[in-house]
Swiss-Prot record:
Role description: Joins adenosylcobinamide-GDP and alpha-ribazole to generate adenosylcobalamin (Ado-cobalamin). Also synthesizes adenosylcobalamin 5'-phosphate from adenosylcobinamide-GDP and alpha-ribazole 5'-phosphate.
Transmembrane stretches, start-end: 2-22, 61-81
Protein name, per record: Adenosylcobinamide-GDP ribazoletransferase
The keyword Ribonucleoprotein appears for this protein: no
A single Gene Ontology CC term: plasma membrane
The organism of origin for this protein: Halobacterium salinarum (strain ATCC 700922 / JCM 11081 / NRC-1)
UniProt KW keywords: Cell membrane, Cobalamin biosynthesis, Magnesium, Membrane, Transferase, Transmembrane, Transmembrane helix
Pathway: Cofactor biosynthesis; adenosylcobalamin biosynthesis; adenosylcobalamin from cob(II)yrinate a,c-diamide: step 7/7
InterPro entries documented for this protein: CobS (IPR003805)
Length: 199
């Protein structure tokens, strides 16, 4: 057990509490809005209209439940890792999630003025090498285990796929895309790190 015999469930709960206390829960709103938009039939403009609706739909509920379940099960897996490996996986996952958000800013455009345009308007694809240069060293955070490298790769890969899907769905990157990319990257990063450790 991690943390000197503390039960895995307690460690997982503490992880979730700290993550949401530090980063906030606004990213989950992006997940919810993306879930609602995903079930709308129509073009990107029709889907963006749903984002302004204050009613929570089944798509939002399903998306948030899946993400939170992914975080819970991923953090339970991390809690079973040796302490140094667990720390490496958590750090690499967070760096990967933020790297994915930076990639959204560098590679996507915003469909309208708002939070998304504040980021995409000030970033270019030319900034990606610097982003990668800052992120890559964290892959060594769990040496000799490659778990942190797996977490980083999983988070960044999931972020890229989510960015591509959501920007196509919504016709660009608004604030909800940034939030959803962050959360999906976090979930996949945790699981990827745990899976790599078991190999």
């Amino acid at each position: 057990m991690l943390a000197g015999g503390v039960p895995h469930g307690t460690v997982a709960f503490a992880y979730l509490a700290v993550v949401f206390a530090v980063t906030g829960i606004n990213h989950l709103d992006g997940v919810a809005d993306a879930g609602d938009a995903a079930v709308v039939h129509g073009d990107p403009a029709d889907r963006r209209t749903v984002l302004k609706d204050t009613t929570t739909g089944v798509g939002a509920i399903a998306a948030v439940v899946v993400v939170v379940a992914g975080l819970v099960t991923g953090s339970l897996g991390v809690a079973a890792l040796p302490t140094w490996t667990a720390v490496g996986v958590v750090v690499a996952t967070e760096v990967g999630a933020k790297t994915s958000m930076a990639a959204v800013a560098c590679l996507a455009h915003a469909p309208h003025d708002g939070l998304g345009s504040q980021f995409t308007g000030n970033a270019t694809p030319g900034a990606l090498p610097a982003v990668a240069g800052v992120a890559l060293p964290v892959a060594l955070a769990s040496v000799p285990s490659p778990a942190a490298a797996g977490a980083l790769a999983g988070a960044v890969g999931a972020g890229a796929l989510t960015r591509r899907w959501l920007t196509g769905l919504l016709g660009g990157a608004n604030g909800d895309v940034f939030g959803a990319v962050n959360e999906v990257s976090r979930v996949v990063g945790l699981h990827a790190g745990v899976v790599v450790w078991t190999l």
